[in-house]
């Protein structure tokens, strides 16, 4: 990432949708994607919305029920001076995978800080549906998010490949990963 991480406040406010409640299909898919990667440890990060908090809490329970380890849970605000403290903590534990959820505005600010200031890798990250939209990915820039993968609300998979967000076709839950996108 070559531009400073902080986005203009008006752009972030327009993207500050609190997000819908996570669906069971979405939670199942996020869990499946993480287990498929054969990860033992995760660090979970989320915005402070009720939906993001509930989604990541449910994921953490499922993860630990599988005998896996949650190294840390980091929350971030929608607006902050720089997100440096949260980004540093999120990346510090060096987990096998990172899991992210939250409203797009705060997530974009946090993600831009991660890219600018830490060794965080999008390709080792799985995200919930609210982050797999053109709007959310566009705030960070798809070219900055190679191999970021996540679940759709209907239990499908979305991924960022070659600078583009790839989602299942409408009406088909499908897997964005017929070509290895998970």
Regions found by a protein language model. Give the residues of each.
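Extracellular/periplasmic bilobed ligand-binding domains
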Residues: 52-156
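Flexible loop/hinge segments that line or gate small-molecule binding clefts
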Residues: 1-17
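Short hydrophobic/aromatic-rich motifs at helix boundaries and adjacent loops
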Residues: 3-4, 28-32, 83
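Extracellular/periplasmic ligand-binding modules, especially the Venus flytrap/periplasmic-binding
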Residues: 107-109, 145-182
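An alpha-beta-alpha
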Residues: 13-75
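Intrinsically disordered/low-complexity terminal segments and short unstructured peptides
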Residues: 1, 40-42, 181
């Amino acid at each position: 990432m070559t531009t400073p991480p902080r986005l203009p406040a008006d752009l972030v406010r327009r993207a500050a949708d609190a997000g819908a409640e996570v669906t069971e299909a979405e939670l199942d898919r996020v869990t499946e994607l993480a287990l498929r990667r054969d990860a033992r440890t995760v660090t979970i990060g989320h915005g402070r919305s009720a939906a993001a908090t509930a989604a990541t809490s449910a994921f953490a329970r499922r993860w630990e029920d599988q005998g896996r380890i949650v190294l840390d849970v980091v929350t971030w605000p929608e607006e902050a001076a720089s997100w440096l403290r949260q980004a540093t903590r999120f990346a510090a534990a060096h987990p096998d995978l990172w899991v992210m959820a939250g409203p797009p505005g705060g997530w974009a600010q946090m993600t831009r800080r991660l890219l600018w200031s830490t060794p965080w890798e999008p390709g080792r990250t799985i995200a919930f549906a609210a982050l797999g939209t053109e709007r959310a990915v566009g705030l960070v820039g798809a070219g900055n998010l190679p191999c970021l993968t996540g679940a759709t609300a209907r239990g499908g998979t979305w991924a960022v490949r070659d600078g583009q967000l790839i989602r299942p076709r409408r009406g088909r839950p499908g897997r964005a990963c017929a070509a290895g996108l998970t």
